[in-house]
A protein has these predicted regions:
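Conserved GNAT acetyl-CoA-binding A-motif
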Residues: 109-121
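Conserved catalytic-core motifs of GNAT/GCN5-like acyltransferases
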Residues: 118-121, 133, 138-155, 164-165, ...
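Acidic/histidine-enriched, glycine/proline-rich intrinsically disordered or flexible terminal extensions
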Residues: 165-193
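Conserved acetyl-CoA-binding loop-helix of GNAT-fold acetyltransferases
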Residues: 94-107, 130-134
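Conserved GNAT-fold acetyl-CoA-binding loop/helix
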Residues: 17, 21-44
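A short beta-loop-alpha structural element at the N-terminal edge
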Residues: 4-16
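Glycine-rich acetyl-CoA-binding "A-motif" of GNAT/NAT acetyltransferases
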Residues: 62-65, 127, 153
Length: 193
């Protein structure tokens, strides 16, 4: 099987939504209740990918996973902070591909001078918590019974990781659209799957 990681295209919206939809309808991993339309999902992709990396994992040309980061909080002092998200189709889970996808995402965020990564995970999603822990994330908090889905209250855990050095005055945040294409290609070209 051939795997490839690349940056998202708006035309990927339907294929990405196909990966995401079961997490909405069948699990408590996503706190959404209703699967968005392809058009709405494409708008989300456009909005996020203008500022932050949004990448997809393909298996023999089929999108089987994706990861992205987005602004964590709006105040200017949070410019170096992001929330990260990853979803993999069940058929590719447990193969180490999530770690590879996240590693690529981290390298792309480093090109933007991002420093602090946060992940919000449903408390009983042990596999995700363990994957994040294996990548250097630390548990920083639990929100008890923060969400209600599928007839039960769910805890949410927050995990965090710092990438790069924290200078006294950090370099400015660079929107993803302004990162040199050659640097993006260099990062993605070095991914071995």
């Amino acid at each position: 099987m051939g795997y490839k990681i690349r940056t998202v295209q708006l035309s990927d919206a339907e294929a990405i939504l196909k990966v995401y939809a079961p997490f909405i309808t069948d699990t408590c991993i996503s706190f959404e209740y209703v699967v968005p339309s392809v058009e709405e999902f494409a708008q989300r992709i456009a909005s996020i990918s203008a500022e932050y990396p949004y990448i997809v994992l393909e298996e023999d040309g089929e999108i089987v996973g994706y990861a992205y980061s987005h602004r964590y909080l709006e105040r200017v002092a949070y410019s170096w902070d992001v929330e990260v998200t990853i979803y993999l189709a069940p058929k590719v889970q447990g193969k180490g591909l999530g770690v590879i996808l996240y590693d690529a995402l981290e390298k792309l965020m480093a090109l933007q001078n991002i420093k602090n990564l946060y992940s919000c995970i449903t408390g009983d999603n042990v596999h995700s918590i363990e994957m994040h822990r294996s990548m250097g994330y630390e548990l920083i908090g639990t929100f008890p019974k923060a969400g209600f889905k599928h007839d039960r209250w769910l805890d949410v855990v927050w995990m965090a990781k710092t990438i790069g050095e924290k200078e006294n005055a950090p370099l400015p945040f660079v929107p993803f659209a302004e990162v040199e294409a050659s640097k993006i290609e260099e990062v993605l070209g070095k991914i071995n799957i």
